[in-house]
Every structure is written in structure tokens, then in C-alpha cells.
Amino acid sequence: MKHTLISRKFTGFGALATAIALLVSLLIPTAHAATYSLPNAPTNVTSYLGARGVVVKWTPGADVEPGVTGYVVSAGAGSCPIYVPASYHSVVTMPVVVGQPGGTPFVQAVNAYGFSKPGLSKQSFTASQLVKVASASNRVLQLLQFSDLHGAIETGGSFGTSLFMSNFAADRKSAAATITLSAGDNIGAAPPISTEFEEMPTIESMNLMKVDASVFGNHEHDRNLAHLQKVIGASDFQWVASNYGDDSLSALKSGVKAAKSYTIIDRGGFKVGIVGANTPETIEQVFPGNLDYTDASGAKKTIQIQAGVTGVNKAIVEAKDAGAEIVVVLIHQGWQENADGIAKGPYNNMAAQIKGASVIYGAHSHQTFSTLIPGGRGKAPVLLGEVRNAGVEYTRSQVCVQNGKVVGVALQHVLKAASSTINTGVVSTVTTPDAEGAALVKKYKDQLSAKLDVKIGQVSGVFPRGGSPAVERSGETPMGNYIADLMRAKYKTDFAIQNGGGIRDTFPAKTYIPANTALVRTGAGPLDVTLGDAFTVFPFGNQLATTVVTGANLWKALENGVGGNYPGDGRFPQISGFKYSFDASKPVGSRIVEVTKLDGTPIAKDSKEYTLTTLDYVIYGGDGYVNVFSPAQAKVKGALLDLFVDALKADMAAGKVTQVPVVDGRIKKVG
């Protein structure tokens, strides 16, 4: 932040005190002193062919906080980007590779928050012009990456299998050295077209998309280990996880196919190491027992997922020792927010500690993010990138190597639909679906439609889900109220709790596309909803159970719910039968401010017991709810999905439209 000093005459002790106070105010930042933002776009961008490439000049945009650290000069897919520190002059020669496609150079400023919009050159160049200044000492590696697909293989709001295939095929024509990667959660929490066939349609889709490697996400463990072994056996790509340990990795195999801590891909003259790391939160986020296995000696063990970057850094060293000249890391951890001049989240914390990677992709938080971080003395910055979930975008990155050294990295978010808020976003121009991919999806869709396109009700509007932060993981939300109220009413308990992460889509579901086009899916409402929508919103097959909870344990449970990586975690409690308020600015473990009954009577942290309905997953310790809901006293009642569907059908039978509930203040965020 820039300050302006006003010259004035100081006299006496009072003036001295005033001067000292002014000096202190300049040295100590206040909470409201700075306005932070992404960088402004460079202007007046011009370019011409030089002796060793394309010379690009620009005028920096107006200063912002956090300060601009540098500029990336690129020309998009297949070009060789170069990085220029902010302290240098605003001119650089962009390398040109042999066979580079034509394009328009552009310049983007970068700071801790991300990239500016591109400043486009007034000049463009054809491939025949670029060949005159191309050099074999310049090489480009292209990376295509997505994450958190969650079985969204149908084309609609998502790219789906067929459009991913056609887009990736077009991108590969721009660079011979192209590698395709996923940062995890390919399966699990998916629409019925994937879940009803044991997720095989998604794995078959990834094979057709020519994915080269993927890290495990927490949702790869939504079913037992035998299922994951089946997934590995069906995969034509390599699974990687450097933070599982050798013993745990030994259980993740099927025949000759096995997960590894890293893999090396030899493509277009590059040897690229791919290293993976899953979130250690997986241990809390999957159903108890899903990580258990029996080793070769017959001993019962549990897959260990280590926190930190020790395993990642070890795998990077091993990959380089094995011949990798560039290493890419896939982390199933997410960016959460830009605040106080810093990009924040477990992904960012880990990336800052990783040594020796050129690109580090994130995932898990379902957000669009990208920036550069320092790469070490004398090295180019490291590229960070993350995408939203459900196949609505992917990243297309270029890594430029000149005389054996990385000199620049660039990233574009390729979007299914335009978004003016994504500075790195470019809308896909490839709109013709791949026929083989479309046929695969149709094969499974035809088997589902008769069962799942059945209308089960009408709703007055769309039940929201997602956003930044996700509404179901950060505060009170209509679907949370609706399902928790149904639980409590059905089993006549004092309270009910639904974890926000169990709500997997809007309702009607964005990622479920009925074959029956007569159904009303858009507009002001009423909107038709189907069994397929219900399966998509609640895909996990959870059972409901009743139990007891003490006042003390209710407080403890709520602290867990607003702790962790709030507002990114699925543990956030949607509730019925009581109210609570919390202050997320306080330390984890002391955020709950007040818990009351509906009439305002305080619920004390004592041994008084209350009856509760919640999910079996939660009772048995999922999402960190360990030993708070008396698992020994739990009684399993019925399926969550049945409760949801039956309520909608009952309204339809009575000629009623199910209303989207208003938020009534049962959950309040204070502070």
C-alpha cells in the first residue's frame, strides 16, 4: 500500500508525539488499510519478429496489492511462454518452437492472488512467419488437466466424455508433447450414470480421453478396497500417490497394474515425472472400514495417508534420479480463498513446501484458481492451477524449456461456458462431440432412463448448492433445512444433523440430464424432478440412524462441524430442532458461540441426553465426528434416499408443489 506524507512543521513534545504516531501508522498495517485484488492487465502490447523469437513490449497496468511479481508472455496452446520478473524492463523475446502454430502474443501480470486478464498484442503471426525464428533449442510441454469430475460424463453443463475427447484431441495437435492428467475425485459422489455401474463408465471414459495419470482423491475411497482394486484394474492410466507409503501402496493393485508413488511419462522428447498426494482428510471423510485391507501375511491393516510433503519431495527426488527432467505434482488439496494479500488453503500451504516441481495442480475444493509461486534461486516460478468440479472446465498449460532450462509456464482455463470473472478463461471453440465417447455414454444412459427418468415430484424452484464458498459447507441452506427437518419428523427425535458434504448437487440436479425432454427443468418453476435427480443429490447410499447425544457432545460435534478447513469441508452441520451460532474468526475448537433449542432455551455443555437422527456415516466417525454420537446406542432405520423420495412423492400425490424452504436463522455466522 502506498502512503503519501504531508509536509508540516512540528514543534514541542506534542508535535513529536504526533510525528511518532504518524510513523507508527506507516509501519503497522491496519485491518482496513489495504484493498487487495488481482492484477490489472498490461496495456499497449506490441510485438514483432526478432532475430531469436518474437519481441513483445507492454506497459504495466496500475499498481495493486498484493504487488505484481512478474509477467507471463505467451501465445496460447503450443507456444513457448517466458516469465519476466516485475523488476525487469517491460520487453522480452518470446522463444518460438519448431512447428509452433500461429497465434497472437499476450501478456498477463501475476501476483499472489492470480493472473490479470491478458493484454493482447496488436500483431498476430502465422505459422509460416514463426518458422523463420523458430529454434530446436526451444521445446514446449503441454499439460491438459482436470479434477473432481465426479462421474460427470454426460455432455450438457459439463464437457462430458465426448467433448473432453474432441477438445483434448484438438489440443494435442498444437504440441506433440502433450500429457493429460487428473488431480483426483474422478469417481464417487457421482450421478447415477456412473454410480449405478460401479463407476466403470467414468473409468472407461477416462481411458477414451487418453488420461495418462491420476492421483487418488478422497472419493476414490467411497467404496471398499476391493472396488478400488477393480477400478485400478480397469484403468489404462497410472494411479499415483506419494503419501500412502509402500505398505499401503502394495494393497492398491489389480493383476499387473498397481499404484505408484510416481511415474515417468516419455512423450515428445520429454521425460516427465508425475507425483501424486491425496488429502489426509480422506481418513475422516470416507466410511469407516473403506481403507482396511489384509496384507500378504494375513494381518489386518489400514491404508495410511500421510500429511505434509515429505512423501512428495521424496518422490520428486526419486523421479529426477530416474531421468525426469520436469516434474508435475498432483495434489488432492484445494485453494480456499484470497484474503489479506495471501492465497490461502491446504493446497497453497503444501505447494509452498514442495521442492523441485515445475507445475503443481490442486483439487478438492472445486474452485478455479491459478498463480505462480517462487521456484527457487535461479529457477522459473512454479505454476499452480485448480479447476471447478463436474467437468465444466479444464486447464491447458504450457511449459517452455530453452536450452534445457524451464524459462516460463502459462495456463489457460478452458471453459464450457463463458465466465467474465476468470481472467485465465477461454471458452472452448470445439463443439463437435466425439462419436465414440457419445456412444459410450449412450450405452449406459439407455440402461438408466427407464428407471431414473421417473417423475417423483415438482419443486417451486432450484435448491442451491455450491458456490464460493459452497453454501452447503459454509452456512444454512434450503436443502440442508429440508432434509434435516424430514429426518427429525420421520423418526420423532429432538434433533437431526445432515453433513453439508453429503449434498452433492443442486435440485433439480445440474449433472443429471433426463432423456425425457418433456420434463420442465428450467424457468421460474414449478420444475419437474426425477429419481435420477434424487440419486444425484444423495449418491452415497447412506442409511439413517437414531441415537442419543449429550449436550456436551453436541457442542463438541458442532465445533468439529465448523472446524477443519472451514468453509471447505463437507463436515459442516445442516440441522433441525435446534439453533447454533459460530464465529469462524476464532481458533478451531472454540468457534461455537451459542447453542439453543428452537424456543431459545440454552443447551448446556452437560450430560443431559437428547435424541438425534443422522447418517450412519456420521455416527461411526465420518467427517471427524468421532465418538460424539454414541455409536453403541445407534439404531439403523432406513435409507436417506428413500426418505427424500417418499416426501416428494407424497407432495405430488397430494397435488402439492414442494416448496424450496426459506432459511430461518437456525444457523448464524457471527463475528
Residue ranges and their predicted role:
Residues K132-T421, S474, M479-L486, V548, ...:
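Acidic, metal/ion-coordinating pockets
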Residues R139-Q142, F146, G151-A152, K173, ...:
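Catalytic centers of hydrolytic enzymes
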Residues Y113-V133:
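Extracellular fibronectin type III
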Residues V96-K117:
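Beta-strand-rich modules
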Residues A33-N40:
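Proline/serine/threonine-rich low-complexity linkers at boundaries of modular beta-sandwich domains
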Residues R52-P66:
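Conserved aromatic anchor
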Residues G70-P101:
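Recognizes extended acidic, P/S/T-rich segments that occur
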Residues A15-L26:
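Bacterial N-terminal signal peptides
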